[in-house]
Amino acid sequence: MATKLWDKGFEPDKMIEEYTVGNDRELDMRLARYDVQGSLAHIAMLETIGLLTAGELEKLTAGLKEIAAEIEAGRFEIEPGTEDVHSQVELMLTRRLGDAGKKIHSGRSRNDQVLVDLKLFLRDELRQTAEAVKTVFDRLQTLSEQYKDCLLYTSDAA
């Protein structure tokens, strides 16, 4: 089994570990597509400041797009023993591209990754919520126009 990022050299009680980790894997799966989006933006920045070559950027971009396609197709999973979605994406890239895959985390902390993922996720959720509210609003507008002459809607008013 892989060493956990937060491993301090002792084995925690399994019940405590299960309680503190909870359903992180399921939540991470919901963030996977946003992790890839954040990584695509990050590697573009790494290339502009000279930490990636143009060739590495091209390979990493293609690799991340492959992972994004796997996520959308429902074929992406966080392997047992892999800490989280960030580690899984890096592991997949490293397997496919070698050391270039390890470079996607240069210059950013885990907290940076989590915050970017959450920001992108919440932005998407808010957009979807706004669209749903607009749909309800439009329907209410249509109904109000349809029944504007009715003082009180009844089933026989139509």
Name every feature range the model reports, one short phrase each.
Residues A158:
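Active-site-proximal glycine-rich helix-loop-beta segment
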Residues M1-S155:
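A helix-coil-helix interface module used to build multimeric assemblies
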